[in-house]
Structure formats: C-alpha cells, structure tokens
C-alpha cells in the first residue's frame, strides 16, 4: 500500500504576522502624510502595484505615480482597511486580503460604492517582509 502525504509547512510565527500587518500600517501612515517615497518603500525593488486602470512596476515608478496622485486625485484623502484573510505560502511568502478604500475629506467610513478588496503579496527577503505585489478591485461590480 502506498500512502501519499501533503507537504507540511511550519506554522508562521507571530513575528511574521506582525511584520506583515506592519506593512499595511506603513502604507496607511505614508498615505496620511502623502509621502510617496515612504509609500513605495514597502515594496520590493521590482514590486508591482495594480489599481483599476493602473499598472506600476518598481519602487521608482510606484513613487512617481503616488507623488502625482497625492497632488491630484488623492489630495487630502486618507486610506483605511481591515484584514479579511492571511495565508502563508511557505516560510517566505504570504497573501493578505483586505477590505477598505480611500476616505475623501470629511469621511470617516469608505462609501459603499467606493469600497475595495485588495490582495497584498508579501515576501520575506533576508529576514524582512516586503510587498512584492499589491492589487485592488472594487468590492461591488459597478453597473
């Protein structure tokens, strides 16, 4: 009789979970100060950011995009989100799913039709967690 077993992966540590949560908090803080350089600093050198109609690759491109966005469409805004799911892909990879969105001036909650779901793909490089890819999409299909 042959038995097949699923590969086992050691459970992630609390410090890994905290480090990944810290990535999201660094993004929120960078957004609060409209600091495009700090925003881009959470990404790997070749990290990607996909927003509706937008694709940016690399820290420099992400920083340039966010610099313009903070002076344009995102001027005066904040961003918020809450985790929905966190899964580890071995010891050095994780996927975080969040629900959130952009808060316009005066808003304390994301408008229902503006809410997004986001996927954060994190990788551990030399013992430190980085954002390799970020993508968001509207929570509801717009008619």
Enumerate the predicted regions with their spans.
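A short, structured loop/turn motif at beta-sheet edges
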Residues: 86-94, 122-128
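Short beta-strand edge/turn micro-motifs at domain boundaries
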Residues: 2, 115-143
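Feature marks short, surface-exposed loop/turn motifs that line or immediately flank catalytic pockets
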Residues: 46, 104, 138-140
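A short, polar/proline- and glycine-enriched secondary-structure boundary/capping micro-motif
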Residues: 106-109, 141-143
């Amino acid at each position: 009789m042959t038995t097949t077993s699923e590969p086992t992966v050691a459970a992630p540590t609390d410090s890994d979970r905290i480090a990944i949560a810290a990535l999201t908090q660094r993004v929120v803080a960078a957004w609060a100060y409209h600091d495009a350089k700090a925003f881009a600093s959470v990404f790997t050198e070749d990290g990607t950011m996909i927003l509706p109609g937008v694709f940016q690759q690399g820290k420099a491109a992400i920083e340039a995009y966010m610099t313009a966005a903070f002076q344009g469409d995102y001027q005066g805004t904040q961003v918020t989100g809450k985790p929905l799911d966190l899964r580890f892909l071995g010891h050095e990879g994780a996927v975080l799913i969040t629900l959130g969105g952009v808060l316009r001036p005066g808003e304390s909650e994301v408008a229902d039709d503006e809410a997004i779901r986001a996927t954060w793909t994190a990788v551990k490089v030399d013992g430190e967690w980085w954002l390799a890819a970020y993508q968001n999409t509207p929570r509801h299909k717009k008619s």
